[in-house]
């Protein structure tokens, strides 16, 4: 029996559910109230949609006392959403605020648990050009020089390879139309950059801000001038 694509398509066709899923693309957990606010819907409506998404296994929930926190189910769910963004019609910008939000997202953002946008794509390009990575089909492979480079950054390549997920997948960036680095390596890079405060998460959005020290580090370590 073929998978029921129509059921998933029906779920994603609802604007409120789509908005909730896009909010969860930052890779973090969110309480229902916050997701309702971000989707501009009532809490009761958000609960209805969250239950539908849970039934479809697109999201998961964690219970802490009386509170429930939601996240995307896994990287496969995130990949489906990211691919749909490539073919979805672009929303018309209606205000200066929306224009700035769009610009911020295009520049640097999280794509579930890795870095995307202009900065993410430039990082991938630079690592390939420097010979740290090479593209093989739709994956990135770490070279011997790359293994030493990532080790110096504090990323254990073997540890990342042993995770139960793709190691370094080419993820097509919906705004740049080029690949950035997904998978365990992409996540390890994002985590390391957050730890070193090269980048910081912006509140209530997937947008990422590059710090002043981060701009220096990107140029020094990654040969990416921001």
UniProtKB/Swiss-Prot annotation:
SMART domains: HTH_ARSR (SM00418). GO terms for biological process: regulation of gene expression; response to cadmium ion; response to lead ion. Residues 32-55 bind DNA. Keywords: DNA-binding, Repressor, Transcription, Transcription regulation. It comes from the Bacteria. InterPro entries: ArsR-like_HTH (IPR011991), HTH_ArsR_DNA-bd_dom (IPR001845), HTH_Metal-responsive_Reg (IPR052543), WH-like_DNA-bd_sf (IPR036388), WH_DNA-bd_sf (IPR036390). It holds the Pfam family HTH_20. NCBIfam families: HTH_metalloreg. This is Uncharacterized HTH-type transcriptional regulator YdfF. It comes from Bacillus subtilis (strain 168).
